[in-house]
Regions:
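Sec-dependent signal peptide recognition
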Residues: 8-15
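Acidic/polar, low-complexity intrinsically disordered N-terminal segments immediately downstream
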Residues: 28-192, 196-201, 224, 476, ...
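C-terminal motif of bacterial Sec signal peptides marking the signal peptidase cleavage site
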Residues: 21-24
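Short, Lys/Arg-enriched N-terminal segments with co-localized hydrophobic residues
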Residues: 1-6
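N-terminal "leader" segments that precede or initiate the main folded domain
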Residues: 17-18, 28
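Tryptophan-paired
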Residues: 58, 66-147, 219, 228-232, ...
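Flexible, solvent-exposed coil segments and beta strand-coil junctions
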Residues: 203-213
Length: 536
């Protein structure tokens, strides 16, 4: 795709300078960069330069491209300052600083170049920093990163998860970003900085120390808190078996997280693609996921944690729109899982809407399926009439009742009469959705839906191994539909609403599900991944 632009990890160059303090200068002298006065006891200078690299330091064997200007602009820039015990000392604002590559693409390298800030006063005990760009601070809903809120608090208390929607952290010109981190645990978020002290008390020596600090900056990378998903249809696209017809109709995300951490700790895993990372979100462990042990509360619990594309149960309900065009992208909150927690109910996925018509039928016509065979309405009525008992004589009435075309207590005579007189205009796009989970399926105008679980690391080939599924912040997942070999379901695959009689429960392992795909992923650490998808 022409617009596959990489969301880049940004790098921040920080320089710190501590000075020996002695009396004799005014506060105005200090503001002008002269020898600071006694009122500046316990302070140091901090200089910050923000630069987005054209290749991240952790991505060693993958292609990268700069993000767009809308994905890269830096407005508010907050630097949280910590002592050696990870207790916050203060917050330094670098709003308005020119950030490297914040203008987006330019010949594949990004512009503008980074500009170092003027030195700012910070506590002398500053040993570590955490950077946040474009923070979501909407009242009580977002993070409160003011000095009054965070001073004196340990990093473990500051690093909270909040309930959010993707628009809170990923809108044009306002993508929230935070330090990417390097080490294990949540403390890995904090980058150590070196304090440079002058070897004398003259202005020349102070200036020399400032220059030394800026010449040897600490480098800090930040990630966007969002993940990006894109779907395309390969050209040529393979439709099987021969004679079948497939028309792409749209796509949408489902099972998206409702919470996001300020910093999600890095997780190591076996057979990782060099340069790839995995992280721990709020509901990473199986014990942290929604309680699905009680069917009466399962759906409520799941919907409190994730957003799902939902089916309809009545004609008055509106069918959810699945209409994102091929070649488009959207963003979602990070959603990661421990190895044994990679389950259908909690794994972010793509739902594809399409029209699939079997080779024996008129393209985009309505049809029924039953036990692997496809029928027009008239063919189904004939098959039903010629079946003395059992088989379709049993299964079709079950579907009609579930679809609310006949009353639940209708007797055999009433059902037979209804089927005899049933016409195509008595069936709608909602019929097959309301009548879901039956042996008989109805595809109105050949419309169906496919489930595509998003794989994280293609290099993880062992089933249910850590790092195999999930969407990670600052990762861009490109799904490429390559082929199709059969119709999907007439209803939206929704793990929070499983088949009550023959369920694939939300607790089913991702690698044991009957998802309609086989996948292939290659990594590019926005970290950029390509996933080939075969629908069936």
């Amino acid at each position: 795709f022409k617009h596959l632009t990489m969301m880049k990890t940004r790098s921040f160059l920080l320089s710190t300078l501590a000075v020996f303090i002695f009396a004799g200068c005014s506060s105005e002298d200090a503001r002008e960069g002269n020898i600071p006065g006694g009122e500046l006891d316990g302070k140091a200078y901090l200089s910050l330069s923000l630069q987005s690299h054209t290749a991240t330091s952790r991505a060693v064997n993958v292609e990268e491209k700069p993000g767009s200007s809308g994905e890269s602009k830096a407005g508010a820039v907050k630097v949280l300052l910590f002592d050696e015990d990870d207790v916050c000392l203060d917050v330094a604002d670098f709003d308005g600083l020119t950030v490297g590559n914040s203008g987006g693409e330019s010949g594949g390298t990004g512009t503008p170049e980074a500009v170092a800030s003027d030195a700012k006063l910070v506590p002398e005990k500053t040993k570590k920093v955490f950077v946040v760009i474009n923070p979501y601070t909407d009242g009580s809903k977002g993070w409160n990163l003011t000095a009054d809120a965070v001073k004196g608090k340990p990093w473990s208390v500051i690093n909270t998860a909040i309930e959010a929607v993707i628009a809170n952290i990923a809108t044009n010109d306002n993508f929230m970003m935070a330090s990417a981190g390097e080490g294990a645990g949540i403390e890995g978020a904090l980058m150590g900085v070196t304090v440079h002290k002058p070897d004398g008390y003259t202005q020349d020596k102070i200036d020399a120390a400032k220059k030394e600090a800026k010449d040897h900056p600490a480098e800090i990378s930040v990630d966007r808190l969002s993940a990006k998903v894109e779907l395309a249809v390969k050209d040529p696209f393979s439709t099987k078996p021969d004679g079948a017809k497939f028309t792409f109709g749209g796509w949408e995300l489902s099972v998206t997280n409702k919470s996001v951490k300020l910093y999600s700790e890095l997780i190591t895993y076996d057979n990782a693609t060099p340069g790839a990372v995995y992280r721990r979100d709020k509901n990473y462990l199986k014990s942290e996921q929604p309680d699905i042990s009680d069917n009466s509360t399962m759906e409520t619990n799941m919907m409190a944690t994730f957003d799902y594309l939902k089916n309809i149960d009545n004609d008055a309900d509106l069918i959810p729109e699945v209409k994102r065009d091929k070649g488009t992208s959207c963003y979602c909150l990070e959603n990661t899982m421990d190895a044994n927690a990679q389950q259908l109910g909690f794994t972010t996925k793509v739902v594809v809407k399409a029209q699939y018509t079997p080779n024996s039928l008129t393209e985009n016509s309505s049809y029924f399926s039953w036990k692997g065979n496809y029928y027009t309405l008239e063919q189904l009525k004939t098959e039903y009439k010629n079946t003395p008992s059992g088989g379709l004589k049993t299964d079709l009435p079950i579907f009609l009742k579930k679809a609310k075309l006949v009353a639940g207590d209708a007797d055999q005579s009433t059902i037979d009469n209804f089927i005899t007189n049933l016409q195509a205009n008595g069936l709608t796009a909602k019929t097959g959705i309301i009548g879901r989970f039956c042996a008989v399926r109805y595809y109105h105008e050949s419309v169906c839906y496919y489930d595509v679980l998003i794989r994280h690391d293609q290099n993880v080939t062992e089933k249910m191994a850590l790092g195999r599924y999930g969407v990670v912040r600052n990762n861009w997942y490109h799904l490429d539909l390559q082929s199709v070999s059969g119709p999907g379901t007439p209803w939206i695959p929704d793990p929070s609403d499983p088949d009550p009689t023959n369920p694939t429960p939300p607790g089913t392992d991702d690698d044991e599900s009957d998802a309609y795909l086989s996948v292939k992923i290659t990594i590019n650490p926005w970290t950029y991944w390509t996933q080939g998808v075969d629908l069936h």
